Amino acid sequence: MTGKRFGRVLKTLRTAKAMGLRELAKKAKVPPGYLAELEAGKKRNPSLDVLKRLAKALGVPVTELLE
């Protein structure tokens, strides 16, 4: 999966949950700037720990982030 595709999936899931970027960042315990870069496709390959925290904060399985 490319960074841009992952970023689109992440942003789509976040907006579907009516969650702001800062809210998700706080729930997942990641810096808002890092989350913004992930969504923009500027950062790639988040760690498994970050993926798990994002998935938990969004209420989805990790695999859904990677589809």
Stretches with model-predicted labels:
Residues 29, 49-64:
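DNA major-groove recognition helix of helix-turn-helix/homeodomain DNA-binding modules
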Residues 11, 22, 52:
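Residues within the helices of the helix-turn-helix
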Residues 43-44:
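Gly/Pro-rich interdomain helix-loop hinge
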Residues 14, 25, 55:
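The alpha-helix within a helix-turn-helix
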Residues 18-38:
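Short alpha-helical DNA-recognition segment
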Residues 1-16:
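A short, Lys/Arg-rich alpha-helix, primarily the initiator
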